[in-house]
Amino acid sequence: MIRISLISKHYQQIEPLIQQFFNDLQIEYKLTNYTHQTIQDIYFVEIEKKNDLNILNHLKKLNSTLIYIIGPKDFDLVSICLQMQTHLYFINNELEKQFIHYHDFIQKQI
């Protein structure tokens, strides 16, 4: 089972998109709110500004942990996220469309 955490102020809006995505992949998963005590396989982290990236320094992770960022269309933030070795950057107002676009890529990462 894949352990997934969503860190977002918009949890209620994003959660169904993530659930639908993993249900479509037919992968057994457990999606929870982020807590400092757990290590997850995948983190979805929503950011709004550069300071929000500090959360990445506090994530408990393994070498195989995937980190997906959900954020604004801001090329400086995208660049910083890539330097921080995150695995994908989703534009927040295009999230559903980007899940479809990256379906095969994410499936291979998992």
Language model feature labels by segment:
Residues 19-22, 26, 79, 103, ...:
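Residue-level detector of alpha-helical secondary structure
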Residues 1-30:
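Short, charged N-terminal beta->alpha structural module
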Residues 91-92:
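A Lys-centered signature of the CheY-like receiver
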Residues 25, 62-63, 84:
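Helix C-cap/helix->beta junction micro-motif
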Residues 73-88:
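Alpha4 helix (beta4-alpha4-beta5 surface) of REC/receiver domains from two-component response regulators
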Residues 15, 35-66, 71-77:
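Conserved phosphotransfer microenvironments
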Residues 85, 96-110:
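Receiver (REC) domain switch/output surface
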Residues 17-21, 58, 80, 98:
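Charge-rich, solvent-exposed alpha-helical interaction surfaces
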